């Protein structure tokens, strides 16, 4: 009902819930609140700023979600929901929260042109194979698109990325992506940020004309 501001931890966990309409007053959803339910889609209202760990985790039926623009804390919110495919972001979103889609089943993502920052581990251990980072993005968080060897060797992994020259701050965003071979560097690059391609499978890269600086550990542990 309208007026509810918080849904507690494990409130509906393991139930047969297939559909839920969340009130516009809701600001916080607790850990495991809807985990292992039968939800097919979820629209998070603009008011939601905090989602606990695995609040929507391990939901085999969940395929679509709408993310509000003010969501700031949501680490591991969809972890284990392996059939999550369709992501819609509310207009005006500027940051994709830390760990938001970590360990979920998404295989493709369209990042809105309003986004300037992608958070720590936001897409770690997902199934994304090709990635286009829009020109608006200046910061990629640590391990934002990384992949862990002990997570699952059977999952598809990143093979191609297209990056804007506006990137200023990165920290091993693609670490562990050993199948990453194709990199497109768009725009007028002056600096290759620190750690950008560390721990990747990149074997060949043409450094653009105009680059005057390569940051520390930019290619550390890669296949170059």
Report the location of each language-model feature:
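Structural signature of tandem-repeat unit edges
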Residues: 1-6, 15-28, 37-50, 60-72, ...
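Consensus positions within tandem repeat domains that build extended binding/scaffold surfaces
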Residues: 8-11, 30-33, 52-57, 75-78, ...
């Amino acid at each position: 009902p309208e007026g509810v501001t918080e849904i507690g931890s494990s409130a509906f966990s393991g139930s047969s819930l297939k559909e839920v309409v969340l009130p516009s007053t809701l600001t916080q959803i607790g850990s495991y609140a809807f985990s292992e339910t039968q939800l097919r889609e979820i629209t998070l209202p603009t008011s939601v700023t905090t989602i606990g760990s695995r609040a929507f985790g391990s939901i085999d039926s969940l395929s679509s979600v709408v993310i509000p623009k003010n969501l700031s804390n949501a680490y591991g919110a969809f972890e284990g929901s392996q059939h999550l495919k369709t992501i819609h972001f509310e207009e005006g979103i500027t940051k994709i929260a830390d760990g938001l889609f970590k360990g979920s089943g998404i295989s493709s993502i369209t990042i809105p042109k309003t986004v300037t920052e992608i958070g720590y581990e936001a897409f770690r251990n997902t199934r994304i194979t090709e990635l286009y980072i829009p020109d608006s993005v200046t910061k990629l968080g640590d391990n934002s698109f990384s992949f862990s060897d002990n997570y699952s060797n059977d999952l598809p992994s990143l093979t191609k990325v297209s990056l804007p020259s506006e990137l200023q701050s990165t920290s091993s965003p693609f670490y562990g992506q050993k199948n990453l071979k194709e990199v497109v560097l768009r725009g007028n690059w002056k600096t290759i940020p620190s750690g950008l391609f560390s721990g990747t499978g990149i074997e060949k890269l043409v450094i653009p004309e105009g680059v005057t600086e390569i940051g520390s550990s930019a290619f550390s542990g890669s296949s170059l």
